């Protein structure tokens, strides 16, 4: 096994984190040109994304305490994503497009983005896609139906980027790795 088996999860320079309406088909290959429904959300912080593919199960045991069957309790996967862009697209992704309004610049203020934060409300379902690149290798992680289920605390401090830490949750994820070695 060579060193090429060790992959880096570096975000693709031309886009890293995308969203589209729920049910939008994922690309077949990580290098495919994305359809017009896919919109780039924003820059991901240097720590990258964290995929948690968790499942839990309850063992069913017989009288001798031997496991006879496993009942699956939960199988939701999550991606934690720290977003360092502060744009209308980011705000709409995190808080829902119906909760973000934009006002044009006037003689008394610049262009305004206003967010109505409704606690306890989860934004609607969407398709999500993360693209990574390491040399010729490309990696794609996506879901056709996911939700932003948690938002981390947001720090507004001098000397550091405003980071919108979000968790995308979905029942089904697709991971594709392409070594980039095409045949002729």
Kindly label every feature range from the protein language model:
Residues 29-36, 62-65, 69, 104-115, ...:
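Surface-exposed ligand/attachment interfaces on beta-rich extracellular proteins
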Residues 52-80:
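Short, solvent-exposed beta-alpha or beta-beta edge segments that form flexible loop/patches at the rim
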Residues 89-90, 94-137:
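Short helix-loop boundary/capping segments
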């Amino acid at each position: 096994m060579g060193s090429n088996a060790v992959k880096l999860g570096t975000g693709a320079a031309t886009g890293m984190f995308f969203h589209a309406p729920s049910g939008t088909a994922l690309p077949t290959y990580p290098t495919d040109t994305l359809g017009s429904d896919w919109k780039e959300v924003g820059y991901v912080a240097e720590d990258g994304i964290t995929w948690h593919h968790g499942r839990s199960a309850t063992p069913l045991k017989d009288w001798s305490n031997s496991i006879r069957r496993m009942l699956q309790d939960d199988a939701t996967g999550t991606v934690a994503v720290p977003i360092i862009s502060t744009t209308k697209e980011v705000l709409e992704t995190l808080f829902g497009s119906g909760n973000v309004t934009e006002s044009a610049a006037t003689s008394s203020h610049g262009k305004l983005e206003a967010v109505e934060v409704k606690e306890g409300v989860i934004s609607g379902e969407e398709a999500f896609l993360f693209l990574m690149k390491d040399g010729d290798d490309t990696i794609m992680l996506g879901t056709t139906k996911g939700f932003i289920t948690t938002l981390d605390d947001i720090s507004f401090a001098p000397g550091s980027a405003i980071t919108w830490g979000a968790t995308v949750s979905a029942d089904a994820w697709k991971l594709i790795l392409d070594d980039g070695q095409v045949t002729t």
